[in-house]
């Protein structure tokens, strides 16, 4: 029976899972990469915190971020449009405070008027833009219109009688401009909105009274036009402040580490301040694996490398090969890179009879005995990423155990150094991977049943790797790892690019409603 080699409990860090799966790492599906992507999409503005800077060459950084994220100009455009839509849908209908006033009506006198149940029912954005400057990110909404509904009432008191009436009215707000400025800074490994400003102005309004005489209409206009404009401006500004405070709290509450399993966690602290470029936003994340329980080390500066664009996708996430190597080191030190196999891929029990042609000495001493293969990684696998893909070198010991008279006996052990390549693709929002054996070199470490001929050692190792090891790993990888994308979002036009010392995941983002 296949024992659990990888304990995959959570759906995250797809790229790390694929690679460390190929390296016999036993860990769950954390997502250093896509975990951030998921959190960003949960709160729209954090899309700006989530995208990676890229380059044809990824420089190594010792204390900076090992995962870099950038939002391109098209990514900012998407973030802007989604942000505006999200704010409108989650804010409306927006209730405004009641308004009362006294107005002098010609030939009638002073009339007490009141507006109640005032609310903004709809907002229509005509034009918008997002800018990145040294002093922050600026979101502007220009020339928007809004529809208001409200109830009106008036009371007129003469010497011996009182006249009153009520009804409803609608208001069209024209020329509404909103401007929001926010500055993101690093606060001990978390992101914080250091400063925020907003402004809302309204050019004019049109009021439509349902019922009432012409004097009433003119009275309402005279009494309330400026007050309605002022109320709309103040209420919208107040609501923006509330949402910015919630966003700030959310950013500071993002976890600084993510538990993977009982052996490891991922350092999720931000390194340095976000960099606002020409129509782009860049952040760095530490991203390294560490033993579970270790204290978080917060780096004081971001990576020194800036990356030139390699494609026009909205989002590009780059991961240095150091992230992968940190994973293999942590799991190797945790002593979990071990696999016990008692069955073949099709479920048949392993037996010495399967090896009588390849390892005749084994079959000669233990004919038709059940057997077990114990595989252990003997040093941290070394990962190397080039423009041609991901390669890894693994030092693996393979022990042959046989069951004889109810006892498990270790009868021989092979040592092999193998080179594997990992290829990846994305199918229906799932990341699919596969391993391919490039080369290997095997030697006999020790044997209790006599020395194996060199050609037998090579043949046995080849069979184990090709018929047992690789099919096992690839079966895991071909199940596909769902990318943690919330239901409102889809990823498309995905491209995986390998560069020197790093891997890039380039993608566009859309919503399920605009497919």
UniProtKB/Swiss-Prot annotation:
InterPro entries: Bactericidal_perm-incr_a/b_dom (IPR017943), BPI/LBP (IPR030675), BPI/LBP_pln (IPR045897), Lipid-bd_serum_glycop_C (IPR001124), Lipid-bd_serum_glycop_N (IPR017942). CDD domains: BPI1 (cd00025), BPI2 (cd00026). Keywords: Glycoprotein, Signal. One of its GO terms (molecular function) is lipid binding. Glycans are attached at residues 147, 188, 267, 278, 346, 374, 408, 441. Belongs to the BPI/LBP/Plunc superfamily. BPI/LBP (TC 1.C.40) family. This is Putative BPI/LBP family protein At3g20270.
